[in-house]
Amino acid sequence: CKEVFFMKKNIIVKKNSVTYQIPPQNVVYMEKDLRRIVIHLSGMASSELVVYGSFHDLIPNLDERFLYCHRSYIINMDEIIIMSHNQILLSSNEGIYFGKDTYRKAQKTFEEYMQRKRKEFS
């Protein structure tokens, strides 16, 4: 993934010869669309950035807050508001739908993540 790299835990994205430094907490989720990655953002001037690349190159560099539970999505678990049945509702009011098996895996990973966070803050 030549257009995405990481430095000091920030995600650095190059698009049209402009370099963006994105704090991970500003990423709501990432969506794979053919050869493009659509990075959905909060707290920034633009609500999304589109770059060319693959999740395969991204995943090893993301911290534990990111959930890769479906071939088309990587979700920032800090942005999850509700998980129910086969849908995840995000802080951006966007819903992401999954099949039962994928949803169960995502729910388990999310619950483990939340338990670790509670331990850190107690």
Question: What residue spans do the PLM features occupy?
Answer:
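Basic, polyanion-interacting recognition surfaces, primarily
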Residues: 1-122
